């Protein structure tokens, strides 16, 4: 995945509505990116990159689209989780890999995509 989000189990348990609303918003953004061209996306975010030429920004976005860097749904699959941990390990940011079934909670993602 391009990115993943995490929270403590206690936070999730005590803030279920917030977690669901956040996940719904992420999914809405994922759908928007899927349904729009690189140029349209670049136009919508160009103000966040004032020193970047719109052509370069469009090219970068298209590159991400071409390699499927952005997931289309917020569900974190085992394969993506493993890849994320591998990247973090290679970067020296992760000492011990975590088991998927103990860490990942797709409950809110599954609800968002209904």
Region annotations inferred by a language model:
Residues 1-12, 23-26, 62-66, 101-113:
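Periplasmic-binding protein-like
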Residues 12-94:
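Secondary-structure end/capping motifs
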Residues 82-114:
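Conserved C-terminal helix/tail region of periplasmic/extracytoplasmic solute-binding proteins
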């Amino acid at each position: 995945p391009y990115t993943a989000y995490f929270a403590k189990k206690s936070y999730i348990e005590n803030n279920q509505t917030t977690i669901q609303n956040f996940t719904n918003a992420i999914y809405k953004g994922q759908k928007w990116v899927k349904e729009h061209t690189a140029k349209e996306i670049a136009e919508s975010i160009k103000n966040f990159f004032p020193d970047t030429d719109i052509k370069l920004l469009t090219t970068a976005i298209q590159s991400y689209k071409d390699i499927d860097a952005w997931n289309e749904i917020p569900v974190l699959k085992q394969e993506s989780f493993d890849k994320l941990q591998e990247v973090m390990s290679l970067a020296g940011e992760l000492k011990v890999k975590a088991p998927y079934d103990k860490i990942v909670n797709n409950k809110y993602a599954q609800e968002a995509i209904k």
